[in-house]
Amino acid sequence: MFITFEGMEGSGKSTALNRVQQVLLDAGHGVLLTREPGGSRLGRTLRSILLDLSNDDIVPEAELFLYLADRAQHVGQVIRPALDEGVVVLSDRYADSTVVYQGYGRGLDPERLRELNDMAVGGLWPDLTLVFDLPPEEGLRRAMTRNLREGTSVSEGRFEAEHLAFHARVREGYLTWAALHPARFRVVDATRTPDEVFEDVMRAVRSVLSAPARP
């Protein structure tokens, strides 16, 4: 079972992901928690390039292929082996982030990005993708507060530094992409309390866990 958590910066997806992991572990499931970029050894190097605030001159096409390289390595080295062992894989971001951020956000063709991602991951798409939705102003406020608290404003603050219009396009991109793929996506209202959000998340997770396994 492969479940991905998507959304803007500061949407609360990482917090929910950790809570889901604990519930599944308590229920006896094997669980792998991972993230993009940075879910493999190579990916950690790429993450330091992609998220560093000082790398503000990366052109959209170069950014795209760095993410695709991270993802191909992540799937081949981490995700597929875990799925082959029957482990539930929970990933903080995956291919849909590239479709939305580089497509709707940067202006590249979303459908072409889906095709490139499909090649990078060998056709491996999630069983469930949760999109945590909230206004970009609120998400940025939360994300900047977190980065200041954790001291990552420079090392992981490149997207938080983007102008508000970019984040508005990202939000609309997520909602548009989710509407185009309703069988896999669930949109979660992330403006509510963490407990209310988590109730919705677990409802969706339990639904997909109880469904017949895909071939």
Swiss-Prot record:
<comment type="function">
    <text>Phosphorylation of dTMP to form dTDP in both de novo and salvage pathways of dTTP synthesis.</text>
</comment>
<dbReference type="InterPro" id="IPR039430">
    <property type="entry name" value="Thymidylate_kin-like_dom"/>
</dbReference>
<feature type="binding site">
    <location>
        <begin position="7"/>
        <end position="14"/>
    </location>
    <ligand>
        <name>ATP</name>
    </ligand>
</feature>
<comment type="similarity">
    <text>Belongs to the thymidylate kinase family.</text>
</comment>
<dbReference type="GO" id="GO:0005829">
    <property type="term" value="C:cytosol"/>
</dbReference>
<dbReference type="GO" id="GO:0006235">
    <property type="term" value="P:dTTP biosynthetic process"/>
</dbReference>
<protein>
    <recommendedName>
        <fullName>Thymidylate kinase</fullName>
        <ecNumber>2.7.4.9</ecNumber>
    </recommendedName>
</protein>
<dbReference type="GO" id="GO:0006233">
    <property type="term" value="P:dTDP biosynthetic process"/>
</dbReference>
<dbReference type="InterPro" id="IPR018094">
    <property type="entry name" value="Thymidylate_kinase"/>
</dbReference>
<dbReference type="InterPro" id="IPR027417">
    <property type="entry name" value="P-loop_NTPase"/>
</dbReference>
<keyword id="KW-0067">ATP-binding</keyword>
<dbReference type="GO" id="GO:0004798">
    <property type="term" value="F:dTMP kinase activity"/>
</dbReference>
<dbReference type="GO" id="GO:0005524">
    <property type="term" value="F:ATP binding"/>
</dbReference>
<dbReference type="InterPro" id="IPR018095">
    <property type="entry name" value="Thymidylate_kin_CS"/>
</dbReference>
<keyword id="KW-0545">Nucleotide biosynthesis</keyword>
<keyword id="KW-0547">Nucleotide-binding</keyword>
<keyword id="KW-0808">Transferase</keyword>
<keyword id="KW-0418">Kinase</keyword>
<dbReference type="GO" id="GO:0006227">
    <property type="term" value="P:dUDP biosynthetic process"/>
</dbReference>
<dbReference type="Pfam" id="PF02223">
    <property type="entry name" value="Thymidylate_kin"/>
</dbReference>
